[in-house]
């Protein structure tokens, strides 16, 4: 069977994506040079020792896979955001494979002569995910053949019923800790109150009863790091289960949390209404500029991209230059910002291009988080690596580090850079503020330190847009922008502040919705959303007068 070879001599090219992966699939025609005829399945299944020779990966949700599957296939149901992360290696892919027979050892995956992937639907989103998986195998020296079945599962099962196994999975998937995915917390799992909970204490839940029929994986964005010593649970020998809510911070016992959680769900619903039309070029919420064959490769995460209407356009010196960067202009009633993703290696020169275009004499960059978290790269270092006095050239831009100092007992770092454009004689200065102790999808642990950081950035006297980034440029970035804006509000705007007021009168709700209309998923998690209310409440209880920032 002739199809794409994954040896070092072959070249993998990630196909352009269609709609944003976070959305419901948009029907469109996808193509892939790695497509192989599904008719080859019977040929492989007829081989006497095919299980030792061929790996068939099914990308559908576990709940669907458990009902019906290609004979001998294994399931891989993970969010695109996780699959695309550079640090998510083949070893981690292999550790997340779910096998019905639970007998095969996939650790020697290099010995498979062929790897076939079956996608849930033959559209660009899923095909691109499959190609990313193939790219990871190739980079780790896989020398066999890699192919994507040219028919999605529903068409395979209809056209080639002889290769389908319809026997239900009674206890193979989901019932045992070893078969569960790495633990992650979604909003639903950590909801403050379960109104449908039975029993006298809804803050303590027993281990869930396995129910394969209703089992599905959450599209989580923050998986806990893999624990090499105990494959079944990142917490050691304890059974992986939904956590008892007694272990959740005391803030979750606040009666207002249920109200806030419902508000957050309404924000999510409003955003979903916008995102369903993002693949339509004529829509106000179109994101198609970010998913062309050239711009797509400059996105750190495939499901977090800018809207066409607010994206930053790099100033081009020739028509052939690409003007794309994963960044959005954000305007609030008090300030102007640029929210962008953490740089990847191929976009560093674009980042400095954006800085040059959008600051005047002194610019301000705010970096939230560290370069690496739990072994995963969150942002590529985009400044000189050898410290003070070192210079580094990124495309047309020469960046020199002037100074570096730890501030507020090393809670954050201030760096100062000089930038020079090869096409202009002038030099611009940039103040770079890094708040490293703020992890992905979470909120800062110290309210006082966060307020001091905001004040310090406010005193930078930079000109032009304040450039803010974390890793994806939405969660921590959006939270910072909301906090920076609210702390500039006058006292009258926050008078009688109460989370229980209607959404139309809630300044936090309205502000988050406002910036989400300019960049998707801003203030990404419920934890971050609640933190904004907590910070305002803390300041008011301390009788701090607004505006805190001027």
Swiss-Prot record:
Modified residues (Phosphoserine): 318, 320
Gene Ontology MF, one: protein tyrosine phosphatase activity
Any one of the GO CC terms: nucleus
Active-site residues (renumbered): 470
PROSITE patterns reported in the protein's UniProt record: TYR_PHOSPHATASE_1, TYR_PHOSPHATASE_2, TYR_PHOSPHATASE_PTP
Keyword Cell division in annotation: yes
SMART domains assigned: PTPc (SM00194), PTPc_motif (SM00404)
Entry-linked Pfam families: Rhodanese (PF00581), Y_phosphatase (PF00102)
Family annotation (InterPro entries): Prot-tyrosine_phosphatase-like (IPR029021), Protein-Tyr_Phosphatase (IPR050348), PTP_cat (IPR000242), Rhodanese-like_dom (IPR001763), Rhodanese-like_dom_sf (IPR036873), Tyr_Pase_AS (IPR016130), Tyr_Pase_cat (IPR003595), Tyr_Pase_dom (IPR000387)
Keyword line: Cell cycle, Cell division, Cytoplasm, Hydrolase, Mitosis, Phosphoprotein, Protein phosphatase
Catalytically driven reaction(s): O-phospho-L-tyrosyl-[protein] + H2O = L-tyrosyl-[protein] + phosphate
Compartments in which it is found: Cytoplasm
EC number(s) stated in the UniProt entry for this protein: 3.1.3.48
BP GO terms, sorted: cell division; negative regulation of p38MAPK cascade; regulation of p38MAPK cascade; signal transduction
Ranges for domain Tyrosine-protein phosphatase: 260-539
Function: Plays a role in inhibiting the onset of mitosis. Dephosphorylates sty1/spc1 and wis1/spc2/sty2.
Recorded family membership: Belongs to the protein-tyrosine phosphatase family. Non-receptor class subfamily.
PANTHER family per record: RECEPTOR-TYPE TYROSINE-PROTEIN PHOSPHATASE, TYROSINE-PROTEIN PHOSPHATASE 1
Protein name: Tyrosine-protein phosphatase 1
Organism phylogeny: Eukaryota, Fungi, Dikarya, Ascomycota, Taphrinomycotina
């Amino acid at each position: 069977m002739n199809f794409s070879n994954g040896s070092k001599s072959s070249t993998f090219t990630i196909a352009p994506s269609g709609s944003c992966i976070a959305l419901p699939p948009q029907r469109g025609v996808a193509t892939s040079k790695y497509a192989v005829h599904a008719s080859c399945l019977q040929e492989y299944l007829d081989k006497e020792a095919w299980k030792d020779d061929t790996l068939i990966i099914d990308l559908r949700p576990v709940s669907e896979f458990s009902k019906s599957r290609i004979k001998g296939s294994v399931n891989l149901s993970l969010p695109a955001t996780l699959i695309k992360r550079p640090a998510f290696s083949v070893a981690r892919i292999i550790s997340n494979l779910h096998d019905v027979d639970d007998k095969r050892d996939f650790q020697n995956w290099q010995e498979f002569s062929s790897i076939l992937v079956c996608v849930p639907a033959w559209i660009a989103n899923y095909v691109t995910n499959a190609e990313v998986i193939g790219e990871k195998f190739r980079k780790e020296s896989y020398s066999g053949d890699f192919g994507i079945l040219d028919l999605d599962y529903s068409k395979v099962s209809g056209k080639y019923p002889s290769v389908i196994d319809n026997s239900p999975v009674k206890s193979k998937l989901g019932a045992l800790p070893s078969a569960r995915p790495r633990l992650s917390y979604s909003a639903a799992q950590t909801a403050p109150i379960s109104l449908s909970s039975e029993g006298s204490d809804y803050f303590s839940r027993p281990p869930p009863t396995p129910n394969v029929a209703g089992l599905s994986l959450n599209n989580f964005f923050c998986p806990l790091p893999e624990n090499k010593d105990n494959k079944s649970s990142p917490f050691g020998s304890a059974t992986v289960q939904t956590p008892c809510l007694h272990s959740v911070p005391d803030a979750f016992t606040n009666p207002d949390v249920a109200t806030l959680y419902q508000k957050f769900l309404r924000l999510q619903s409003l955003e979903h209404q916008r995102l369903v039309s993002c693949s339509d070029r004529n829509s106000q919420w179109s994101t198609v500029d970010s998913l062309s064959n050239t711009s797509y490769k400059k996105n750190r995460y495939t499901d977090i991209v800018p809207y066409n209407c607010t994206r930053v356009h790099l100033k081009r010196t020739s028509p052939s230059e690409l003007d794309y960067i994963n960044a959005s202009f954000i305007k609030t009633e008090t300030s102007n910002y640029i929210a962008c993703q953490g740089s990847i290696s191929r976009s560093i020169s674009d980042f400095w291009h954006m800085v040059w275009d959008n600051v005047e004499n002194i610019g301000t960059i705010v970096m939230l988080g560290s370069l690496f978290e739990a072994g995963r790269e969150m942002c590529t270092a985009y400044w000189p690596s050898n410290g003070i006095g070192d210079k580094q050239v990124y495309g047309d831009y020469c960046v020199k580090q002037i100074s570096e100092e730890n501030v507020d007992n090393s809670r954050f770092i201030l760096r100062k850079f000089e930038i020079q454009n090869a096409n202009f004689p002038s030099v611009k200065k940039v103040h770079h503020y890094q708040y490293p102790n703020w992890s992905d999808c979470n909120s800062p642990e110290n309210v006082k330190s966060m307020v001091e950081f905001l004040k310090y950035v406010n005193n930078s006297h930079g000109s032009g847009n304040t450039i803010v980034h974390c890793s994806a440029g939405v969660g921590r970035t959006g939270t910072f922008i909301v906090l920076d804006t609210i702390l500039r509000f006058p006292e009258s705007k926050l008078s009688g502040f109460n989370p229980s007021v209607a959404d139309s009168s809630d300044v936090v709700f309205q502000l988050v919705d406002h910036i989400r209309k300019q960049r998707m998923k801003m203030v990404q998690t419920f934890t971050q959303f609640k933190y904004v209310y907590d910070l305002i409440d803390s300041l008011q209880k301390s009788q701090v007068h607004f505006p805190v920032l001027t």
